[in-house]
Amino acid sequence: MRFPTAAFLLAAAVACAGPRAGVRSANDAAVRFTYDGDADEVYLTGDMTRWRPRPLVRAGRTWSTKVPVPRGRWEYRLEVHRGERVDVVLPADTERVDDGFGGENAVLRMP
């Protein structure tokens, strides 16, 4: 896998020893979104999906999806479903903005 010079890694624990959410560039035009934790389903929603839920694929305990993301500023969030409960999970060390509904979105900047 080739990583461009501007490749980045945003991954941090959401809770001390809890699940992790992350983002990393897969190549110059695609980004891999990941979630490592217990869940029934995980979805990416954001500007790059036109806010339509895109399912992450499970491999063991890790969920991921690779999405084409052009240059620019993109807001997104991961929605983690556990039974009746839905949690919004963002990488801990990422820029965040108000989502206009009392929550937050993460910000991804593609150079």
Spans of model-derived segments:
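Bacterial N-terminal signal peptides that target proteins for export
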Residues: 1-7
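Aromatic-rich carbohydrate-binding modules that target alpha-glucans
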Residues: 24-73, 81-110
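Compositionally biased, intrinsically disordered low-complexity regions
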Residues: 7, 74-75
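N-terminal Sec signal peptide cleavage junction
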Residues: 16-19
